Each structure stands twice: as C-alpha cells, then as structure tokens.
C-alpha cells in the first residue's frame, strides 16, 4: 500500500472514532506507524490511529484530542468495541 492510500485511510476515520494501525494497513501495522512518523501534514488526524488494544502512544496529546471528539475510554485505553471505525474493506467495525 502506498503512502497516499495510507493517508487517505487515516483521513477517512471520522471524528469520535479510531482505527488500529492494522486497520489502516491490514497485515502490516508497522507500515502505518512508519508513514505517520515520516509525514508532517498539519490536517492529518494522526490521533485517531491507536494500537489494536486501544492503548495510546506516550508523550503526545492523543488522549486529549480524542476526548475532545467524544471518544470513550476504559481507563487509559480507547473503548475499541464502541469507537472503532471501519477503515477500508478489511477493517473490523463494532
């Protein structure tokens, strides 16, 4: 999957929802992480991409940004059963 397609999938995640790295790039979750680490696009909703277990990257404003969009948490993890978005044809949705 090329970078443009990865970015399109991330842009398709609606406010209040999240996708796991593996939802963005099925079978290659690290590819999504690599693209996010290399692209500096101001309007890209990077905070909507989380780990499959709902945990977040450390040291970023991710939790604050997700809460502002109404994403629900269970402790420090996103409630994936409620907040996971479909992201392409192979993504799982609640």
Model feature map: region roles:
Residues 1-94:
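Nucleic acid-binding interface residues in structured DNA/RNA-binding domains
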């Amino acid at each position: 999957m090329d970078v443009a397609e990865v970015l399109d999938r991330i842009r398709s995640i609606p406010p209040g929802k999240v996708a796991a790295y593996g939802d963005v790039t099925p079978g290659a979750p690290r590819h999504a992480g690599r693209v996010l680490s290399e692209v500096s696009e101001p309007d890209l909703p990077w905070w909507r991409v989380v780990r499959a277990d709902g945990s977040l990257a450390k040291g970023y404003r991710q939790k604050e940004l997700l809460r502002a969009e109404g994403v629900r948490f269970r402790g420090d993890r996103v409630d994936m059963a409620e907040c996971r978005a479909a992201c392409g044809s192979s993504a799982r949705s609640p």
